Amino acid sequence: MNSDTTPTHRNKSNSISQLNKVLPVPIELHNGESLEQHQQNHLNHITNVIVGEYHLISGEFGKSYMTWQIKITINDLDYSSIVLYKRYNEIYQLRQDLLKIFPPHDHTITTNIVPSLPPKDNLSLDRLMMSKNWLEERRKGLQWFLSNVLLNPVFQNCSVVKQFVLS
């Protein structure tokens, strides 16, 4: 055989070292986005808020207080949800903190208006517990407030909202 037609044999170690020099192909998702682009374009966000049952908690020195169960769903995934238990005062404080950031007289965008809360009742907890209608109206008011705050993308990105959800 002629030396021009002789097949060339590669050295195995030489091939492996050349493979190691080749950069990996960047990962692309189905729509052509890179992994970095996908993470920037598809940040986690709250997609549903449900205020559920109230729970009566026995506090220090026998004084009781009420908490509300709040289920927050992330990215429309039931398995990606957070369940919080918050007192009315904590929700009230969230509103006060939002009003400091988004004052009522400074509405550049109408979606940034901080919604109102149902009024705080000064009646004793025992008397309130007797009124199931009052509790349901309170739950509906909290549902309305939290939905309007937590589902608003501007409020969602606010540090006080993140702190409320994560604490």
UniProtKB/Swiss-Prot annotation:
InterPro entries in the record: PX_dom, PX_dom_sf, Ypt35_PX
Keywords: Endosome, Membrane, Vacuole
UniProt subcellular location: Endosome membrane; Vacuole membrane
Xref: Gene3D superfamilies: Phox-like domain (3.30.1520.10)
Disulfide bonds: none
Membrane topology: Peripheral membrane protein
Entry-linked Pfam families: PX (PF00787)
Signal peptide extent: none
Gene Ontology biological-process entries: protein localization to membrane
A GO CC annotation given for this chain: vacuolar membrane
A GO molecular function held by the record: phosphatidylinositol-3-phosphate binding
Domain PX: 46-167
Protein role: Recruits the lipid transfer protein VPS13 to endosomal and vacuolar membranes.
Family: Belongs to the YPT35 family.
Domain notes: The PX domain binds phosphatidylinositol 3-phosphate (PtdIns(3)P) which is necessary for peripheral membrane localization.
Protein name: Endosomal/vacuolar adapter protein YPT35
Species of origin: Candida albicans (strain SC5314 / ATCC MYA-2876) (Yeast)
Gene that this sequence comes from: YPT35
